[in-house]
Structure formats: C-alpha cells, structure tokens
Design a protein with these regions (language model features):
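Intrinsically disordered, low-complexity repeat and linker tracts
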Residues: 1, 27, 157-160
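Positively charged n-region of N-terminal signal peptides that target proteins for export
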Residues: 1-5, 13
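Hydrophobic membrane-insertion alpha-helices, especially the h-region
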Residues: 9-23
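Membrane-interface motif at the C-terminal end of an N-terminal transmembrane signal
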Residues: 20-33
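Tryptophan-anchored aromatic micro-motifs
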Residues: 31-56
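Contiguous, well-ordered beta-strand patches that form the walls/edges
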Residues: 48-52, 70-144
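Post-signal-peptide N-terminal segment of Sec-exported extracytoplasmic proteins
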Residues: 50-70
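Short, low-complexity, Pro/Ser/Thr/Gly-rich segments in the mature regions of secreted, periplasmic
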Residues: 148-160
Length: 160
C-alpha cells in the first residue's frame, strides 16, 4: 500500500467515527422528549463521584404536562399503572402542590405551584438512552427563596 492510500483509509475511518459519534450524541441529546411521557423515574444526584443516598420519584403523565414528584416509590409506581391511576394520585397530591413538566431538546423542566407560587428546576444538557437519562447540571428558581445553578450530575432511572 502506498502512503497516500493509508492516509486516505485513516481519514475515512476517522470521518466515520466522527459521524457515528455525532449521530449518537444528537440522538441521546434529543431523545428525552419521546422517552419520558407515561413513565416513572427514580432520580438521585452524584457530586464529585459520590452518590446521594436520598432518592425522589417522578411519574410523568402520558397525555398531559402533569407530573407527580414524591419520596414514596409505591405512590409513584401506582401513578404509572394507568392514566386513570395517575389522575387519582395527581388529584390527591395537588391539594398541597401541583407539578408540571416540559421536555424539549436536551432540557427537562419541572415546575411546582404551591400557594400560588411557582418554583422551577431545569435540567440541562440531558443525555437519554436505554431506560435512563442524566443531566450534568441544573438551574433552579425557588419561590421567595432565590435562584441558582448547580453543577451536579442528576440521574433518572426508569423503574416501571
């Protein structure tokens, strides 16, 4: 083989790797929109390589922008059984606070309305594949408490 042929083959292989990697990244960064409706996720954080032992659960409605956020795994799983069960659990939870969600591109936003005050958490740089998605950071705006950004990995694992 000539030197020119070897360089051409190496360049073609590198180009194929870049295209494949870019395609996977695009898929993973835009797939969350399709994967969360109608499912239940356990989410927890990871800071400096250490997992947080506290977990929360979120159930996403299949047909609306409603969400249920709870520390009770059985309540979240019950909400994930059917849209009818979801509405029952949502109605009970919304007596104190109601949750909504929006997923677009590589962002997921959870909003909580409590006492007519809105608090929001926006998970940025979301990568989704398999039965989980993760975010490398999130921003928050808490009613009457302030706002900020947290550079902490959040992992959402599908449990239903």
């Amino acid at each position: 083989m000539t030197k020119r042929k070897i360089v051409s083959i190496v360049a073609a292989v590198l180009l194929a790797c870049v295209v494949a990697g870019g395609s996977f990244y695009y898929y993973a960064s835009h797939h969350v929109v399709k994967m969360i409706p109608g499912h239940v996720y356990q989410y927890s954080s990871n800071l400096k390589g250490k997992d947080n032992s506290r977990s929360m659960y979120v159930a996403f409605s299949e047909n609306s922008d409603k969400a249920i956020v709870t520390q009770d795994k059985s309540e979240a799983l019950k909400a994930g059984q059917s849209e009818e069960q979801f509405e029952k659990v949502y109605k009970a939870q919304s007596k104190t606070a109601s949750w909504k969600y929006k997923a677009s591109g590589n962002k997921v936003t959870l909003g909580k309305v409590e006492n007519k005050q809105l608090s929001q958490w926006q998970y940025n740089s979301v990568l989704a594949f398999g039965k989980h998605f993760s975010s490398s950071n999130f921003t928050y705006q808490i009613a009457k408490a302030g706002q900020g950004q947290v550079k902490q990995k959040m992992t959402f694992k599908q449990i239903d």
